Amino acid sequence: GILVEDLLTLADRGEEVMVEGNAYDPVALLTLFVKRSLGLLGMHVPMAKIEAIMFTVEDLTPRMVDVLLRVAGGLSLEKANVSFQNHLESFYAYTLHQNKELYQNDVVVYEYNSALKMMCLSCNEHTTPKVVLIGQQEYEQMLRRVWSTEEETCKSQKEDLDELFDGIIKESLADRQVSTVFLIGDGFKEDWARESLRTLCRGRRVFQGNNLYSKGACYGMLERLSPSEKWKQYVYLGEDKLKSNVGMRALRNGQEAYFAVLDAGSSWYETSADYEVILESGDTVEFIITPLTGGKVMDRKVQLTGIPQRPRAATRLSVHLEMTSVNQANVTIEDLGFGELFPSSGKAWSSTITI
């Protein structure tokens, strides 16, 4: 057989894979790989009984979302049962499923594969819901080492790496209250961390392993299917999450009220809304953007140019919102008229709003 590595990267780049002179679609090969991997579970869980599946990858770019949707489509699983989240959200989901004492303060992950990467989860307990943020820092100076075959040289290399990591720990954690640290990645399996581990373990809980993201993906899927009471108390504002609530002012029982359309904390690539409203007057539809990060509340207006003039509250509108990126949404509005008295004009308006 021919070994093909880095299928996910190849699929993300859209590069054809050459095998014995034949060109193959990398997404098709990735789909086959996932299907065969799921097939290994066949003795325990037949694919027909899989209720939901979560993919977790390092970065969920629009291109990667498209790749994963194509993979999911090739698995003969219902799209509604397939979700995606990046590694940071898997870290968040994993953390929230630990004992509270482990995330009483900040939680840090050091990931060491090609180069060292640090992620720090912090929570603002004074908001409702509680807002969770995750910061990232890369340390290119701590690249994976190629160990010498000569014993003394190898020992010296490991001591140097240990000293380098020890310095990074002291610098990166100097101004933080950290409850727990997770060490993940193959680089930590190479038996070089001595003094750095002693530094790390002073006043902190430290764990090492390689299944944090996969377990976090499972926890994340469970919460999407049936959110726990604890989960509802938090909102994670990651890079691919809406940072603001989107709503409209509406009349309910004669009183002005807020009508929620999109919720902050939702993944942009899974976020859309469809609903109908009655336009009371005028020729604009207005959306209210409320940042959870404490910024100024903003209004976004969509102009309904050429909408038929009708009596007050005699125009029914169909509204569709769909996120196209983390801070932009496409809005499509259609005139539905108002029964037999005022038939639909067939007009529709499209606009892009910034959130």
What is the role of each PLM region?
Residues 1, 95-138, 315-336:
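Gly/Thr-rich phosphate-binding beta-strand-loop-beta motif of the actin/hexokinase/Hsp70
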Residues 1-3, 122-158, 341-355:
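Short glycine-rich, Thr/Ser-proximal phosphate-binding strand/loop in the N-terminal lobe
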Residues 1-56, 142-166:
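Conserved phosphate-binding loops in N-terminal lobes of ATP-dependent enzymes
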Residues 28-96, 210:
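Active-site neighborhood for divalent-cation/phosphate handling
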